[in-house]
Every structure is written in structure tokens, then in C-alpha cells.
A protein has these predicted regions:
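Aromatic-lined carbohydrate-binding/catalytic grooves of carbohydrate-active enzymes
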Residues: 1-89, 93-112
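Alpha-helix-loop-beta-strand connector modules within alpha/beta enzyme cores
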Residues: 16-23, 118-136
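Beta-sheet entry/capping signal
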Residues: 27-31, 98-99, 135-137, 233, ...
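Short secondary-structure transition/capping segments
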Residues: 43-47, 111-115, 150-152, 249-250
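Glycan-recognition surfaces
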Residues: 45-82, 130-242
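Active-site cleft segment of glycoside hydrolase catalytic domains centered on the general acid/base Glu
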Residues: 108-122
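Carbohydrate-binding surface patches
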Residues: 221-223, 227-235, 266-291
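Aromatic- and carboxylate-lined catalytic core of secreted/periplasmic carbohydrate-active enzymes
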Residues: 224-268
């Protein structure tokens, strides 16, 4: 992360612009994942521009342990802003991407100072992103939900889902938040009021696959159904070409829910959640335990 203007010629022999053109020719929009406010310790940016890093007591601020660990960039540094402006110009206007998923955005504002609160700093960072992206679609991720209000098209409202139902205790030593399917569902439920008001809610991905996934069939169905009914983004990390006939049928069921369910209402009572909705004019109800 950090070296966003460099392209691997072996993986992308025709460049990213050529790949985007192929995607558009197939009738799809093209999206790209970026983490603009952080850089990895192994990146050229980290090694060549130590003055671009946000520092505490003279030391770069580490804000995540993924990969080689990553560090926050200082959005008060004009050189950082100029670099990021060039990154988005290249990605959106030269390469032609239609959507960017922007992750680890909290790195712009891990703390405030005497002149600016943390929330104000985060909001300023989000305004910068919108100014750089113009009318292109933004999916925000890893950002406090309030500073993103009205500045992104879609926003993650939950923690990351897990390949198991809940996280193991030692993962909390390495991550700022829980990686938990159970907790992600609760986040999606209790932040449902944001959907369509502050932005479109992204509840993270769902799984239908069997391989590399420890969720039971019931747990996978619950996660996917809640995402379809209460979210505005419908994504899976599965490889759909590997689906069985039964998994394809389940995907079609979920897609129908996502596109056609109406009058969705929720009610929580005694640790049990009920979701009522209409599908083709017929009342439907989903019940599950919250905790």
C-alpha cells in the first residue's frame, strides 16, 4: 500500500487503462481498491518520503498490523495532498475507473490536536476525497460513520465478517476492531437507519461457498439474508463460477430479495430480531437471535 502509481507489468501487461477498457467493453463498470491515507512499511513511499508520515514524538504512527504493517500519512503536509491528488487523477481520469473502494480511512485522523478535533480532521479528510473523486462513485471503508455522512455514495457500516461465526480472543491483540460475522450482522441491524439517508450501507460480503469457510449453512443464510434486506451493497467474496446448482439457486433467491423486497421493517425484543418485508406482495418474516 502506498505506491499507487506503480503497476506490475507482469500482472497487467496492457496496463490498468487497458484492463478498464476491456471491462467497459463487456458492459461492466470498473472499480479499484485503494487505501489513500496509509502506506506499508515495505513501500517505496515509506522508504523515500519519511517526511510524509504522521509522527508522534518523532516516530511514524503505526495504525495497522496487516501485511508489513502500515502507517498514517500526514494530511497537513502539502506534498502528501499533491501526491494523492495525482493518484486520483490517474486512477479516475487517465485509467478510467468508475468506482473506488477507499479503505483504512481512519488513518487520516487517529487523533486530534489543540486546533482541530479528531472528528473535524476526519471530516476534512473525507471532503478532500470527495473533491478529488468528483462525481465518481466512492465506497468508504474503515471510516467512522458520522464524518462520512453525505460525502460517500456507500459506506461500510460493520466490522469485517469472519470465516467463522465469531473471532478468537487473540485476534483482538492485532486489530483495532473485531473480525466477526456475528458482530457484523449486529452492526448492520443497528445501523440500518443510515441506509439511504447518510449513504448506501455496505454490510461487507457474504459467503455461500463451502471451501475455506467454517460457517454453518444456517449462519451463511442468515448473514446473506440480512445483507440483502438491510444493505445497499450486495457483495460476495466467493468465486461464483465454482457454485453448485444449489448455491446458484440460493444466490438467485438472495438477489431477488435485494432487488425486490419492499416495506422492510425490523423489531427487536428479548434478544431476538424480527425482519418483516413484502416480496411480490406476500408478507415474509425472518427471525434470529441477536447475541
Amino acid at each position: 500500500m502506498g505506491d499507487w502509481l506503480e503497476t506490475d507489468a507482469q500482472k497487467f501487461p496492457h496496463g490498468l487503462k487497458g484492463m478498464v477498457q476491456e471491462i467497459h467493453a463487456s458492459g461492466f463498470q470498473a472499480g479499484l481498491w485503494l487505501a489513500p491515507f496509509v502506506c506499508e512499511k515495505d513501500s517505496a513511499l515509506f522508504l523515500q518520503h519519511p517526511d510524509w508520515l504522521l509522527k508522534v514524538d518523532g516516530k511514524p504512527w503505526c495504525c495497522g498490523s496487516n501485511w508489513s504493517s502500515f502507517y498514517a500519512l500526514d494530511i497537513d503536509n502539502p506534498a502528501v495532498l499533491d501526491y494523492l491528488r495525482r493518484v486520483f487523477d490517474r486512477v479516475l481520469n487517465d485509467w478510467g475507473f468508475d468506482l473506488v473502494k477507499l479503505d483504512f480511512l481512519y488513518g487520516a485522523a487517529p487523533f486530534g490536536n489543540v486546533h482541530e478535533s479528531r472528528a473535524a480532521r476526519m471530516y476534512r479528510a473525507m471532503e478532500l476525497l470527495r473533491s478529488w473523486c468528483g462525481q465518481k462513485t466512492i465506497l468508504g471503508c474503515g471510516v467512522p460513520v458520522i464524518p462520512a455522512f453525505g460525502l460517500v455514495d456507500y459506506c461500510r457500516v460493520s466490522c469485517d465478517v469472519s470465516l467463522d461465526w465469531d473471532d478468537v480472543w487473540y485476534m483482538r491483540l492485532f486489530h483495532r476492531e473485531r473480525v466477526s460475522t456475528k458482530q457484523a450482522i449486529n452492526n448492520t441491524v443497528f445501523r440500518r437507519q443510515l441506509n439511504g439517508r447518510a449513504y448506501g450501507s455496505d454490510p461487507d460480503v457474504f459467503f455461500l461457498r463451502e471451501e475455506n469457510c467454517k460457517l454453518t449453512a444456517e449462519q451463511k443464510r442468515t448473514l446473506a439474508t440480512v445483507n440483502a434486506l438491510l444493505g445497499n451493497v450486495f457483495l460476495t467474496s466467493d468465486m461464483p463460477s465454482h457454485y453448485t446448482d444449489a448455491q446458484r439457486a440460493e444466490y438467485r433467491r438472495l438477489r431477488t430479495l435485494f432487488e425486490h423486497a419492499t416495506q422492510v421493517q425490523t423489531e427487536a425484543e428479548n434478544d431476538r430480531l424480527s425482519i418483516r418485508y413484502l416480496l411480490d406482495g406476500t408478507p415474509q418474516k425472518l427471525c434470529f437471535d441477536l447475541f
